[in-house]
Amino acid sequence: MKFELKTTDGRARRGQLVFERGTVQTPAFMPVGTYGTVKGMTPEEVRETGAEILLGNTFHLWLRPGQEVMRAHGDLHDFMNWQGPILTDSGGFQVFSLGHIRKITEAGVHFRHPINGEKIFLDPEKSMEIQYDLGSDIVMIFDECTPYPATYEEARKSMEMSLRWGKRSRDKFDALGNKNALFGIIQGSVYEELRDVSLNGLLEIGFDGYAVGGLAVGEPKEDMHRILEHVCPKIPADKPRYLMGVGKPEDLVEGVRRGVDMFDCVMPTRNARNGHLFTTDGVVKIRNAKYRSDTSTLDADCDCYTCKNYTRSYLYHLDKCNEILGARLNTIHNLRYYQRVMQGLRDAIEQGKLDDFVTEFYRRQGKPVPPLAENDVK
């Protein structure tokens, strides 16, 4: 993988990630394909929304279908018939989400299989092996996602163990002869000093890109913005920056304003299945009875298959009848909306008009523009 930075506007960056499997324009949003599928979508449909890279979940694909099945197909690209780049998470966040049925030690994580109760152990070395078999174009180190809230001391201990696990991940990745990219994950909760220690430790080990982890776990938006403003300028300019598990459309805009290059989130797909649709003028909750006879298009500014062919009334009807097509059409739209936001951000950075884009984005959403830190203002 090669990262090429084309231009900047303030702290926002316009670039591209070059892989053997294709080029990804940044800033980029990665749809989430948990079990080797973006729920309800064919790979061709996902590609048509504008997505150039997907995220797969190491933890879930390890449990089902397992490494043997993956190897029998070649890798995850062959298994799911997506020939573009794939980033896989390490399994750390999923293990964190298991709560009471897992035990974290220096060696790794002991937990019960969430389906059959079997005892399982996952460590940095195993995570690297699984991601190697998946053929991931971007591999993430195995880390502990620090819970929120955490005291300074809790966050410090968690971050330091993640650093040690990061070194073990790097060593195993290299021992496997993996020629793809490996990203480090910056931890440290809401504490700037701990974020610095984490980043410096990761820089000593050396990675192809750097993710900001442990955000979007319940902390106030102001804390997320503050940590991004603090951390992003310290990441080497020639390395991509990835904000994990984020987020709402405005979170993408705010991340880009602060120098983030990559995002992923289940929100556009999960919310689509719940009738929660993102549009240029704000959220449409399609289950609301006011849409029963609404013959207007979902989003007049959108060029997706759903908006070009169907009315809000029809989408309301499909949802009311629990028709599978409703979830699919909603997903097509939400994914396309997210990609249109990213395209708008990329174009604005290229033209040196990011401030204009941001102002118009929030005006249409009916929201105020969040302030940048003083040293971020052009």
UniProtKB/Swiss-Prot annotation:
Q: Which residues bind substrate?
A: D89, S90, G91, G92, F93, D143, Q187, G214
Q: Which reaction does it catalyse?
A: 7-aminomethyl-7-carbaguanine + guanosine(34) in tRNA = 7-aminomethyl-7-carbaguanosine(34) in tRNA + guanine
Q: Where is the signal peptide?
A: none
* One Gene Ontology cellular component: cytosol
Indicate the residues that form the catalytic site: D89, D264
Q: Write out the entry's keywords from A to Z.
A: Glycosyltransferase, Metal-binding, Queuosine biosynthesis, Transferase, tRNA processing, Zinc
Q: Name one GO molecular function term.
A: metal ion binding
Supply the SUPFAM superfamilies for this chain. tRNA-guanine transglycosylase (SSF51713)
What Gene3D superfamilies does the entry give? Queuine tRNA-ribosyltransferase-like (3.20.20.105)
Q: In which pathway does it act?
A: tRNA modification; tRNA-queuosine biosynthesis
Q: What is the cofactor note?
A: Binds 1 zinc ion per subunit.
Residue ranges for the region (RNA binding) are 245-251, 269-273
Name the GO terms of the biological process aspect. queuosine biosynthetic process; tRNA wobble guanine modification; tRNA-guanine transglycosylation
Cofactor(s) needed by this chain: Zn(2+)
Q: What is its EC number?
A: 2.4.2.29
Task: Summarize where Zn(2+) binds, as residue positions.
Answer: C302, C304, C307, H333
Q: PANTHER family given for it?
A: QUEUINE TRNA-RIBOSYLTRANSFERASE
Checking HAMAP family in the record gives:
Q_tRNA_Tgt
Q: What does this protein do?
A: Catalyzes the base-exchange of a guanine (G) residue with the queuine precursor 7-aminomethyl-7-deazaguanine (PreQ1) at position 34 (anticodon wobble position) in tRNAs with GU(N) anticodons (tRNA-Asp, -Asn, -His and -Tyr). Catalysis occurs through a double-displacement mechanism. The nucleophile active site attacks the C1' of nucleotide 34 to detach the guanine base from the RNA, forming a covalent enzyme-RNA intermediate. The proton acceptor active site deprotonates the incoming PreQ1, allowing a nucleophilic attack on the C1' of the ribose to form the product.
The UniProt family comment states: Belongs to the queuine tRNA-ribosyltransferase family.
Q: What subunit structure does UniProt give?
A: Homodimer. Within each dimer, one monomer is responsible for RNA recognition and catalysis, while the other monomer binds to the replacement base PreQ1.
Q: What is this protein called?
A: Queuine tRNA-ribosyltransferase
Name the species this protein comes from.
Aeromonas salmonicida (strain A449)
Q: Which gene encodes it?
A: tgt
